[in-house]
Each structure stands twice: as C-alpha cells, then as structure tokens.
Curated annotation (Swiss-Prot):
Protein name, entry field: Aspartyl/glutamyl-tRNA(Asn/Gln) amidotransferase subunit B
Source organism: Nitrosomonas europaea (strain ATCC 19718 / CIP 103999 / KCTC 2705 / NBRC 14298)
Family note: Belongs to the GatB/GatE family. GatB subfamily.
EC number per UniProt: 6.3.5.-
GO biological process, one term: glutaminyl-tRNAGln biosynthesis via transamidation
Length: 478
C-alpha cells in the first residue's frame, strides 16, 4: 500500500522583549537559576499580571508579515495543568480569540514552490525548566524562563514530507528574525518546533491518528524525527496495528522517538478566559502604524532582486535568507551598480565559504561590503584577475581592515596589460611547447587551454587573461 505523510508544525518563537510578557522581570539568557523570577513569575498570592505592550506589537508585526487577520478583541485564557515548573498551576495562553488568525507563507523544495497555510499565532507565557543533572535522585526547578513571552505559530497540516517541514520551519525562522521579533537562537531555545505527524493511505482525505513530537531544537533533528516517526507509523499499520495518539520525544543519540505521555486535547486543559486580564482591543490606527514600520519583506525583496537586478530565483532566495545578508548585498551593489551578479557570486561563494568555515554570521565578517566592492572593482577595471582577487580576498580577511588597493600595491599584484610583455611570454611558451602547438593546429582544443595556463604561470598570474587569449590565438594562426 502507498502511504501519504501529513505534517503540521507548532513553532514557539521567544519574543525579543527585554522583560517578560506579564511581569517586569528580565529575560536575559544564562543568569543564575531563579535569579530572574519575580513575585508574578513564582505566583505569590495577591500579585496580578500586567501585559507587555511590546509583545502585542511583535505579534501584530508577525501577523501583517504573513497576510493574516489581526483579531480585536483578543482574549487571554488559562490553560490548566500541573507540572513542577509551572508555579500557578496554569499557563496564560490564548484559545478562542488568538491575536493572529490565518495567513500563509511560501516554501521552496527543489524547483517546486508551495503555499503553507497558517491556522493561528497566539501569545503565551513559557514555563520554567526542570533540571536533573545536578541533583541525584531529585529534580531542580529553575523559574528564570517562567513568564517569558512566546508566540506560538500553528500551521495547517499542509506538509507532506520532512523536507517540506524543514523548509517551512526555515522560512519562519528567517521571517521572525527579519522583522526583529525573535533572535532565532535554537541552541538557547528561542525557536523550538513541535511536529504533529500522521500517515494515511495515498488518495485518502481522512486524517490519520497523529502523534506530536516535542521540543525539536534544530532543523536536522526535525527532519530525522519526522522520518523516523513516519517509518514507525507505517510499520505499525502494515503489521495490522493501530496508532495511539500520544506525545513523543526525539532521542538524538538513538535517532528514535519515544513515548512521553498520552496526547491531550483542548478540553483536557479546561481552558477559560483569564479573569485577571481584560480582552485586548487593538485599534486599526495602531495596526496601520506597525504596518508602515515593517521592513521590506523577504518575498518582496526576492521579487525585486529578480526583476531589477536580473538574478536567478536560486540566487535571490539565498540572498534573502537573512536580512543582514540582503543588506550586505545591497550595500555592495550601491558601490558597484550594474554588477549585481558578480556581487551575488562572491557573497555566495568566497564570503559564505569563509563564514561557514569560521562559524560566523555575515554581520561579523571582517570585510565590509564597501571593501569587498572595492576588490571587485579592481576585477572589472582590469587591475587584477579573478584568480589574483581570491588571493587578495584571503589577505583582506586576515588583515586589520586593509583595503584591496593597499594589498595589491604592497604585493605588486597589478595585472600586466602591456602587449609587448605579453607577446614575449606567449612566444617563450610556444617555443618551449612545439607538440602542444601542433596538437592545437591539428584540432585539439584542449591544447589551447594548456598553453594559456602556462603563459599565466610564466607571468605569475599577472598577465591579463583576455589579452593572453587574444595574442595566443593570433600567434597560433600565423
């Protein structure tokens, strides 16, 4: 039997506010346990939550970026369950009136583009953290994270493979960073994925029994967990068994999912409106003000790069994967108008390779976009060849801000375009390689490339390649 995979994702994006969503406590990462939990966070009697206005604005910003509806009024509800790191015995979340409803994003897998619908995005507070490593036979509770503002982004079950799920998660990861509402640091838990996975016979419209895989904090783990879970469910069904609706966790060391607890539905949490928080009324004027402040979004910038700069879709997708990368590219193009493809090639090639090797973000590149544009200018005006430019790039990376011109002059790397000197090198190479000359004249084109290489070697890479080609062809046809 052929099976179809059905996947929906719930993504928790930690909002980049300076304080928590219902208290004034700091959200700085890495503080001593329980040093950033105030009376509201630890649920002392008599305290009341006060909603963080910035969290509301961030949620609206996200909703506008995905073409969603902003609900007004928006209502907070209590999600009731008992857990050691949840001091109140309930979590403040949203159920019936989320702040963001609907919306969509486009993903790319291979050559295929697909639209993924979003169900909703709602605000909620994070729980604390249970730790086990330092307490033999006991559990430690750290409430620093309790009350931290989250935007939970829920998709429709529109994904049909782990590749699509990863592509969707990457699009959202890029978007929340792009619009400045989340730092996206997956190692610190700022961006976490829960995957709802089921399978059904190919062609069926009915949804299968789903299992939820919790707290996947890397794209690689997301892909591997989904692949394992799909194979597990198919194996059970083909053996005559049935799938139990449950929550599972992914064990990266064993590369498997394991049962965590039975899966709860909304009624199990006994949601009801929080009596301590009034419904949030969002004026249209405020929404319009936030819309005006939105940066150019990735999809719009991508289309502009294709139309205005003539870039291929693949190149435009890469350059708009992060706002800092797009800014770097645009600053280069402003210095080198008409050379957008050359700028894109160097960013995606030499710059990205070096950044990946050293584990750096583009914002920490030791070569500024203006400096790199200065290097490429020396290629376009014939001062140096592309090969020499790569050597200059390496020197610029390792220097303390030296410009391309400084390094070119210090190392005497300027390209030689003097006809008489190039003719001398060509004549010397032809005299030393009579067999290759004969091969070329006999129709073997590869011999020509070999001769070009030897001329460039003789000139120590300084000869103008275009002139070498021209002089060499002239000599070989004489």
């Amino acid at each position: 039997m052929q099976w179809e995979t059905v996947i929906g994702l719930e993504i928790h994006a930690q909002l980049s506010t300076r304080s928590k969503i219902f208290s004034g406590a700091s959200v700085a990462y890495g503080a001593e346990p329980n040093s950033q939990a105030c009376a509201v966070d630890i649920a002392l009697p008599g305290v009341l939550p006060v909603l963080n206005r910035q969290a509301i604005e961030y949620a609206i910003r996200f909703g506008l970026a995905i073409d969603a509806t902003i609900n007004s009024p928006s209502v907070f509800a209590r999600k009731n369950y008992f857990y050691p790191d949840l001091p109140k015995g309930y979590q403040i979340s949203q159920l019936e009136h989320p702040i963001v409803e609907g919306g969509h994003v486009a993903i790319q897998t291979g050559d295929q583009e697909k639209t993924i619908r979003l169900t909703r995005a709602h605000l909620e507070e994070d729980a604390g953290k249970s730790t086990h490593e330092e307490f033999h036979g006991m559990t430690g509770i750290d409430l620093n994270r309790a009350g931290t503002g989250l935007l939970e982004i829920v998709s429709e079950p529109d994904m049909r493979s782990s590749a699509e799920a990863v592509a969707y998660a990457k699009v959202l990861h890029s978007l929340v960073r792009w619009i400045g509402i989340c730092d996206g640091n997956m190692q610190e838990g700022s961006f976490r994925c829960d995957a709802n996975v089921s399978v059904r016979p190919a062609g069926s419209e009915a949804l299968g029994t789903r299992c939820e895989i919790k707290n996947l904090n890397s794209f690689r783990f997301l892909e591997r967990a989904i692949d394992y879970e799909v194979a597990r469910q198919i194996d059970i069904l083909e053996s005559g068994g049935s799938i139990t609706q449950e929550t599972r966790l992914y064990d990266a060391d064993r590369d498997e999912t394991r049962t965590m607890r039975s899966k709860e539905d909304a009624h199990d949490y006994r949601y009801f409106p929080d009596p301590d928080l009034l419904p949030v009324i969002i004026p249209q004027e405020w929404i319009d003000q936030i819309r005006e402040k939105l940066p150019e979004l990735p999809k719009d910038k991508r289309n502009r790069y294709i139309q205005d700069f003539g870039l291929q879709t693949y190149d435009a997708n890469i350059l708009t994967a992060a706002r800092e990368l797009a800014d770097y590219f645009e600053q280069m193009v402003s210095v080198l108008p008409g050379q957008s493809k050359l700028c894109a090639n160097w960013i995606m090639g030499e710059v990205s390779a070096r950044l990946n090797k050293e584990g750096l973000e583009i914002a920490r590149s030791p070569i500024s976009p203006e400096q790199l544009a200065g290097l490429l200018l020396r290629i376009t005006d014939g001062t140096i060849s592309g090969k020499i430019a790569k050597d200059v790039f390496d020197s610029m990376w390792q220097s303390n801000g030296d410009s391309a011109d400084t390094i070119i002059d210090a190392k005497n790397l300027r390209q030689i375009s003097d006809d008489s000197e190039i003719e001398k090198w060509v004549d010397d190479v032809l005299a030393a390689n009579p067999q290759q000359v004969a091969d070329y004249r006999a129709g073997k084109e590869k011999a020509f490339n070999s001769l070009v290489g030897q001329v460039m070697k003789t000139s120590k890479g300084k000869a103008n390649p275009a002139q070498v080609n021209s002089v060499l062809k002239k000599r070989l046809t004489e």
